[in-house]
Amino acid sequence: MTEWIKVCEENSLKDGDLLDFDYKDKKILVARAGDEVFATDRICTHAYADLSTGFMNTDEKTVTCPLHMSIFKLEDGVPQNLPAEQPLNTYPVKIEQSWIYIFIE
């Protein structure tokens, strides 16, 4: 089933915030960089590390895995360095009536 899932109020996610969000069997990272909000898989593709405990670079729009320091672009999930080689899944995001939604298939 594909649907838009309500995550949180827009004003509760500040610039640089990394939010962990679970929906059914998916572990999702919701991140804010300036006026943009991104949603990706929350678990590093190299090792089972939770990216919501990682480090965000708002200028580069990236998140760094806290375990082995792989960097992922939030826009498309592509890893920028080793050891990660596989991209994160990304999810469409919309803001409607001050709420952040992500689209999950």
Role assignments for model-derived ranges:
Residues T2, G16-L19:
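Intrinsic disorder/low-complexity signal
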Residues L18-I104:
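Rieske [2Fe-2S] iron-sulfur-binding domain
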